[in-house]
Amino acid sequence: SGKVTIYWQDGAESFLDPISQEADFEGYRIYGARKTANDDLGEFSLLLEIDLKNDIGYNTGFSTIRIINEFGEPDSILINDTYYHYKFENANIKDGWLNYYAVTAYDQGDPDANLESLESSIYSNRVYVFPGKAAAKENDWVGEPTVYPNPFKGQALWDGYGSRSKMLWFRNLPNEAEIRIFSLAGDLVDIIQHEESYNGADIANIDAQKNPLMAGGEHAWDLITMHDQATASGLYLFTVEDKNSGQIKEGKFLIIK
């Protein structure tokens, strides 16, 4: 099982309520959901609720999510030219599944004005994540590449309808690699070019327009051959070549239909 680390900024804490014109921020809620079979989206579950230490709510404080420096003081982390102040780790989640996450902020409300607490929409900053193994860096490719699910028994639970909505994953890949798939007779079935920035654009079962975040060391395959045919049942062999070092590793997987 893998984990997803969610980072976010503290801008909501200085937001002025449009009605009261006061900075009445109270806390954050983190939600998660997993894509189920045939493109259904499960209900969002509340993973964490955390709020200021005052006379409202649970008074948890932010110490469990705040990014701190070596001296224990509040700090930030720079990721892709953006500074983030908080993080939350969702552990023990299954690799290869599409997960949805959202961070919302909510205010204190105003009992005197008969106003309930307001919360930002879970859809305003929703992100799409495929947990998995990070890419092996140059000259640091440890272990063997593998395939999951293996064996592939007709359909994985994350598959949609139709032969082009099936999907399995190659795992433990270098940051730049070429995957070659062969039949047991030695016939070349498909060639896949992998880069660490892979976003699933070559797979019908992955909506790349939603900019899904991936670990970098995994690549999906739709079980369609290079001749645009569905693969048959059988044992398949594959090689993975590290494009930087030239190192080649081998593996095999079974398709049962």
Show the residue positions of the predicted features.
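Conserved aromatic anchor
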Residues: 2-22, 170
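Exoplasmic/lumenal beta-rich domain surfaces
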Residues: 22-24, 29-92, 146-149, 157, ...
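Short, conserved beta-strand segments of beta-strand-rich sandwich/propeller modules, principally
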Residues: 27, 98-102, 167, 232-237
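Beta-strand-rich modules
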Residues: 90-112
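Beta-strand-rich extracellular modules
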Residues: 104-108, 224, 239-243
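Extracellular fibronectin type III
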Residues: 108-139, 248
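Glycine-centered coil/turn sites that cap beta-strands in beta-rich domains
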Residues: 140-180
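C-terminal tail/sorting-segment detector
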Residues: 227-229, 233-257
